[in-house]
Curated annotation (Swiss-Prot):
The lineage of its organism: Bacteria, Pseudomonadati, Thermodesulfobacteriota, Desulfovibrionia, Desulfovibrionales. The keyword Transcription regulation applies. The keyword Transcription regulation applies. One of its GO terms (cellular component) is nucleoid. PROSITE patterns: SPOVT_ABRB (PS51740). The gene is mraZ. InterPro entries: MraZ, MraZ_C, MraZ_dom, MraZ_N, MraZ_sf, SpoVT-AbrB_dom, SpoVT-AbrB_sf. Residues 6-52, 81-124 form the SpoVT-AbrB domain. One of its GO terms (biological process) is negative regulation of DNA-templated transcription initiation. SUPFAM superfamilies: AbrB/MazE/MraZ-like. Pfam families: MraZ. It comes from Maridesulfovibrio salexigens (strain ATCC 14822 / DSM 2638 / NCIMB 8403 / VKM B-1763). Keywords: Cytoplasm, DNA-binding, Repeat, Transcription, Transcription regulation. One of its GO terms (molecular function) is DNA-binding transcription factor activity. This is Transcriptional regulator MraZ.
Length: 149
């Protein structure tokens, strides 16, 4: 896994957000110029390094005969994406339309999810943590994943 853990961060009025040192290292290992592609999904901003974004984009655009709903979904994900670069201080600038879509305020949470990281409004992330996940073990088992705990 590439991106793990979570961190509370503050975003400034210009939308600049400092990534954690571990996330910055991962970005630079996949993209020497420090590029990240951001898009919106499920109410949060999702960040991909160029190789992982290319894989996702290829998968989405190679779907044969997608339904209208799926075409619209793909359209929103790809057309709503923006490539940004880390600045000298290790910050990314989140475009205003993505900040608005993600309902991001000053206080945010970075959450590592393997091949990507997510940027959540702090209140939304805390609400996510309050959800009851007891019933997901059955769904995981159906997918062939048995949790050892």
């Amino acid at each position: 896994m590439k991106f793990r853990g979570h961190a509370h961060r503050s975003m400034d009025a210009k939308g600049r957000l400092m990534l954690t040192p571990e996330y910055r290292d991962q970005v630079y290992s996949d993209s020497p110029d420090g590029c990240v592609t951001l898009t919106i999904f499920e109410g949060n901003i999702v960040g991909f390094t160029p190789p992982d974004w290319a894989i996702l984009e290829e998968k989405l655009t190679s779907i044969k005969s997608p339904s209208r709903k799926l075409r619209n979904f793909i359209r929103i994900i790809i057309s709503g994406s923006e490539e940004v670069s880390l600045d000298k201080q290790g910050r990314i600038t989140i475009p205003s339309y993505l900040r608005k879509s993600g309902k991001l305020d000053k206080d945010v949470v970075l959450a590592g999810v393997g091949d990507r990281f997510e940027i959540w409004d702090k209140r939304e992330y805390e609400a996510l943590l309050e959800q009851d996940f007891d019933d997901v073990s059955d769904e995981l088992a159906e997918c062939g994943v048995e949790l050892p705990f």
